[in-house]
Amino acid sequence: VRRPLPLKTAFRRNLTLTTLTFMILVGYTSPTYAASTPRPKNENIVVHGISTKAVRHLVEVMVSSPSWDHQLARWDSKLCPLVAGAPELFKGVLLSHLYSNAQIVLHGLSKDCEIKNVIIFFSENGQQSFNEILNKYPSLIKGYNSIGLNRDDYEELSRREIEALQADRPVRWYRSTSTEPASGTIVGKDPLSGKLTTSSIDGGSRILQHTQARTTSVIVIIDITEASGATWKQLADYISFVVLAGPKLGENFNAISIMSLYNNRTFQKTAPPAMTPFDSAIIQALYESETAVQSHDEQLEITQSVISRLGSSLHLN
């Protein structure tokens, strides 16, 4: 039986935003990288009736990057969620789904954490809540945990980003990321400019870079009126994908993904009942792919990995 989200009267009123005060995380452990998935021999392979080219496009919007030369960000084991404004019962459902999905790719993840860096906020007016957060934190905590390797970590939000976050929609989100030294990278300081420098222990590579991107915080705001219609499970998996993968805000997603739940900014009755094998393959490929490359190279690797993972269980032609 599909249980729609309860009316907004089921949620606590008059919530404050004091829970959005972040503390700086300390320490970082470089993840272990999996070998790149080889390019498939058949470039015309079809997954769920979708061509390789279309799968690549899906990857680009489901694991998004500000531009092709940026790097894709992912979490390390310091992910620590806080849910505010939801009924106690759904808090448990949401956290259970989020931890279950995260533990597949984040080894060493602990539920016993103190520094909250994933704020999932249920509001009676998502637009108003975002504006309140923006007024209090104009940078949306951007760059708060950066060591200064990349000035992009500190750039102010663009007008386009702010407008997208202010638009009426069931769910809105924003990720803060930090540029970190990649595995095998030495960080130094230029004696004249004082700027941080990077160099590779083994001399470097034409493709591999000296840096990688790490997700440091995520703010998710659910408008409880606009989001109504979905089941708790659907919404929990939708939020889990948002937190773990970083899809593009405002995009319409293919119906094979739980992310199609709110296409066209409204609940879609035809959306999957839960996170799909395609969604899971995207997340696993993201966390197994090479991190020290530009986003377009990594998205290609993720595309190939998704096709490789799903090809044996699907009818491909």
For each predicted feature, which ranges?
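N-terminal secretory signal peptides that target proteins for export/translocation
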Residues: 1-12
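Bacterial N-terminal signal peptides
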Residues: 18-27
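Boundary at the C-terminal end of the N-terminal hydrophobic targeting segment
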Residues: 29-36
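Short, flexible turn/loop "capping" segments at secondary-structure junctions
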Residues: 39, 71-76, 212
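N-terminal secretion/transport leader regions
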Residues: 40-50
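Hydrophobic beta-strand segments of well-ordered beta-sheets in folded domains
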Residues: 43-45, 75-81, 218
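Compositionally biased P/S/T/G-rich terminal and signal peptide-adjacent segments
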Residues: 50-75
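Long, folded non-catalytic interaction modules
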Residues: 82-102, 106-317
